[in-house]
Amino acid sequence: MADNRDPATPADSPRSGVTRRDFLDRGSRIAIGLGALQLGLGRSAFGDVLGMVGKSRAGELPAESTIAADEVTLGNASITATWTTTSGSFRPAKMTDGLNKSSLPVPAQAFVLTFADKTTLNASDMRMTSPPQTESLAADPTASRKSERVAGRKVTISMRDTAGRIEVVWSGVLRDGSAYLRQEITIRALEGEVPLREISLVDFNAPNAMVPGTVRGTPIVIGTSYFAFEHPLANNGVDGDRIRCRMGRTLPLRPGTTIEFSSVVGVTHPGQLRRDFLTYVERERAHPYRTFLHYNSWYDIGYFNKYSDADALAAINAFGTELHQKRGVTLDSFLFDDGWDDSKTLWRFNSGFPNGFTNVEAATHKYGAAPGVWMSPWGGYGQPHADRIAYGKEQGFETNKEGFALSGPIYYKRFRDTCLDMIRRYGVNQFKFDGTGETTNTFPGSPFDSDFDAAIHLIGELRTEKPDLYVNLTTGTYPSPFWLRYADSIWRGGEDHSFAGIGTSRQRWITYRDADTYENVVRAGALFPINSLMLHGMIYAKQAHNLMTDPGNDFTSEVRDYFGTGTQLQEMYITASLLTPANWDTIAECAKWSRSNADTLVDTHWVGGDPQRLQPYGWASWSSRKGILTLRNPSNVAQDITIDVERAFELPPNAPRQFLAKSPWAQYRGTPPVRFRAGQDRKIRLEPFEVLTLEMSAV
């Protein structure tokens, strides 16, 4: 369950707010039957789909750090930075792009702090309290974050302002094999409250910079390099030739408390921006990409109504039997959406669950899965929302105009404790957090700057408890890739489901879903990975408006289109009794295909046109093992799309030049393969509403 998302404030600059279409004008072109759409293309920086760092690659690009005289250097063959510490004053000196044999722009300051009275404190005006330190970072094979599974180097400098109000610990971090360098700062108030209002981590002048998106938390791109404050609420902006990456703050910094922020600078091979940036995202996100197939109760047993333990068990057993036992499908979770709680309490089970999720957990384990649960930080929707708010106000839980205030200390504790109890008592492996609340306003007495800030801290606490937890952060998010430092997926925007274009209700639903993705994500956040969206799944359920039947036999098209997106959050909003054996077979075939091709589908990116305009479109992904192309025609007339696999797959220079394409689906087994040659256009005819899936192997 989700709702229309809140609009994100764009970065504050004339050249901020570049749409993906504008951004991709600098890339290569794919011709389609209705015109041409620009695609930003590139070759992998590390020789496979994402340049995933294995032992050999990390060994080829080891991080090194040195401290000599008044210089501190951190780097590898891809990127190197040097800072000076002359007379105890810390300043950036130079940065080198080893991939492109060029220099990178250097800020005058490592950071700048701005206070409520508009005064500023530069890093160079602070005084080092100890000599620079360098240390090795050990690889932790059990870490959730992939970068932490790789060794590296870290340099650290501690400093204080001359008034003795603030201590800052600055660190430069580089992991082996990385083509990016991260800057981390920890700020601590020493005596009295410090009215800190803004932290700037990147500020310099450079021509031809751009922000490839219209939402906050979008990286700045300059040629083959990128710069960003690593936070979804940050303002990464371009104003003329001035580049700034900064983060506002509302609350004063209390004595003894600390806050942490970070930034990144990365380099890419020419034409490689999307894929090489995706490499960075995959390494630094909370958890790497993974397929996560699960049932969701919304539209089935719950739709603004309460359901029971018996209802949940029936759904678990139906899906477990049909998919896991009969068809050998791996199921990851069974998520119970709105309706499990008594909305006249606050996140307590309704009377239909006398033992909580105890029976649910046992049932999911029979099929190799675990329970998941929906919770809404702001309290949900409709009458259940009104009931929760009314009860919450009586009990003293904090509220704001959106509903509950997660930044309120009392409510935060109840919400956090409920989440931790779900993990500890019932083995919950997934949270769907639906509706986060205020992005900027602070609740009086809160330790958090906003409800979103509270949500980020909450997720951190939950991941400490369960590192492989799946977190789906829905309403209120937008396509900043830095949400993925905390959550596994975010909402595509728009309605849960609606209809667009022409054809049957199911075809119009597919068009609506994909058009929303194109408009809200592909165009608004060029560097956000499509693989990490909540798309609102496959829908065939008894309480889903106009999607409780399939008179046009379009369900197979919906399922193949859905898995072709490469999304890792694979949701089934399905009533088991409505499906035929053939429907179950389709889901099973596609789910197995997706899981076995995750190493390729992680690279999924958009190709073609605008579904809303009934233009043919789809998704392409490539790895050294194969290429995958999924295409759809949203029109009731046949249309052509012209594909050059070199451009569609962003082939590296050493990749094969010829491919044989065939469908992976059993119904097309025996169909002769079709040859594609890199650098040559090939016209593909798509019949009305056709969904075509092609796997391409090198000749």
Residue positions per predicted region:
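N-terminal export signals
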Residues: D22-F46
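Active-site-adjacent "subsite" loops/lids of carbohydrate-active enzymes
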Residues: Y303, G372-Y426
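Beta-strand-rich N-terminal accessory domains
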Residues: D48-E135, A143-T156, D161, V168, ...
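Acidic, His- and aromatic-enriched active-site or binding-groove loops in soluble protein domains
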Residues: F353-V360, K393-A405, W491-S505
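Active-site groove signature of glycoside hydrolases
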Residues: V329-W340, R416-G445
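N-terminal secretory signal peptides
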Residues: M1-D22, F46
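Conserved structural scaffold segments of CAZyme catalytic domains across common CAZy folds
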Residues: P132-A386, L569-Q612, S621-G627, N636-I641, ...
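Active-site-proximal substrate-binding groove within the catalytic cores of carbohydrate-active enzymes
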Residues: N76-A77, M95, G256, A455-Y668, ...
